[in-house]
Amino acid sequence: MSEPIDLSQISPSLKAEILAEALPYIRRYHGKTVVIKYGGNAMTEERLKQGFARDVILLKLVGINPVIVHGGGPQIDQALKKIGKQGTFIQGMRVTDEETMEVVEWVLGGEVQQDIVTLINHFGGHAVGLTGKDGGLIHARKLMMPDRDNPGEYVDIGQVGEVEAINPAVVRALQDDAFIPVISPIGFGEDGLSYNINADLVAGKLATVLNAEKLVMMTNIPGVMDKEGNLLTDLSAREIDALFEDGTISGGMLPKISSALDAAKSGVKSVHIVDGRIEHSVLLEILTEQPFGTMIRSH
């Protein structure tokens, strides 16, 4: 596990250098939207949670518009365990029956989201929580999961959705009024059902629709790793396809990297996978020139 950066040990002169280094990036991203997929340890360790809240407040203060899409897998697992249910995953997607969907809505749209909003507001920011059902934000359709063992057939994984369309009006309205949107990845379908959507997929689609300058996806590893455990700092579409094919990218990383690549192909100028276990990883990625995590390229 990466050692956290101990900011208390940084000298005043080095802090001044860091601030000076950030100025060109503040100018570059001023007035631009940055979508952040927030998840993993950064959502469960108190030190990292507080650091993240301060980071997004600082981004807003210097004129950058952060939009947060959060996950909550561990919290959902804990809630399911309390009612005697075991989480099941297929190709990185949670199988979601009706009872599980009720838990997902309660945990993501309630407990997890409000924790994030409360912490940002506590430190002086102005955050507003939304689900994809608010303001018609995320229109969803049922996800048909291809059966890898039976080509041409599909596996029913319940109320799991994919993004059919995004109406960004409510997000733009919040940005115009200087709020920080915090979005739970729950969509609504024409059938009247709620759908559990992978947060990585929502973040990628939202970044595209908002014409975001950058998409940052936080995870619990340094970035995309090869089979020997080495960090891959820069990946093209062709290289990613090869990593899918040989199984290097698997499980929960499948939707994350697929979404990141789709966003890059759709015009999001900068897409990065970063280690959320490192304190202030979002600021390090956005406001410094230090190579950090894995950059995803469309070509």
Curated annotation (Swiss-Prot):
Give, as one word, the top-level EC class: transferase
Cellular component terms, GO, for this chain's entry? Answer: cytoplasm
This entry's Enzyme Commission designation comes to: 2.7.2.8
Residue positions binding substrate: G72, G73, R94, N196
Q: Which pathway does it take part in?
A: Amino-acid biosynthesis; L-arginine biosynthesis; N(2)-acetyl-L-ornithine from L-glutamate: step 2/4
Keywords for this protein: Amino-acid biosynthesis, Arginine biosynthesis, ATP-binding, Cytoplasm, Kinase, Nucleotide-binding, Transferase
- Kindly list the biological process annotations in GO that this record carries: arginine biosynthetic process via ornithine; L-arginine biosynthetic process
Keyword Coiled coil applies: no
Q: Which family does it belong to?
A: Belongs to the acetylglutamate kinase family. ArgB subfamily.
Q: What is the name of the protein in this document? A: Acetylglutamate kinase
